[in-house]
Amino acid sequence: FLYKKRRTQTILDFVQNTITPLMISIGDAWSRNEIDIHHEHLCSACIERYLQSEIGKFLPRKGLPVILFSLPPGEHHLLGLLMVEAVLAERGAITINIGSHIPLNNLKLAAISCKSDVAALYFRFAYSSRDVLPTLLHFRRLLPLSIQIWAGGTGISVVRKKPKGVKMIFDLNEAVIALTEPLEL
């Protein structure tokens, strides 16, 4: 099913029109006790592996940023992060995904050693709303100003005032547009 759909869609369309509705349906089925949590995790794992294989097929384009992708400390659900990475990799960004469970100080070291232009953090809806802004502010203080921070995911909707030095990205289309904009330093 996924392979057939993907052949007829860009990654952006595939993520928005196939994966997202599928995962919402699975989450709804789980909340109604129609499936067990292991079914949801199995589906997520299959889609994660598929997206990782797709990301490996894309070639970077000159002039686009090097983006280090990670989840904030305490977050461990990778699917949303991989969906964003896949969309930007298809567009030609150089993507480096270091996953989850990385303390912010280590993310700083990774961003510097990978010569990243951008460090992107993905906040899920379930991430503690009281921790989103402090995490972003602390990370901004740690990183050199030459590295931009992009914050995305539904969890950032709780932030009322954009933190200085952080680009807030509210959907995949904004992420695609951000690739072509000059980096804010």
What are these regions (language model features)?
Residues F1-L59:
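Long amphipathic alpha-helical segments
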Residues E34-D36, L42-L185:
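C-terminal regulatory/effector modules of DNA-binding transcriptional regulators
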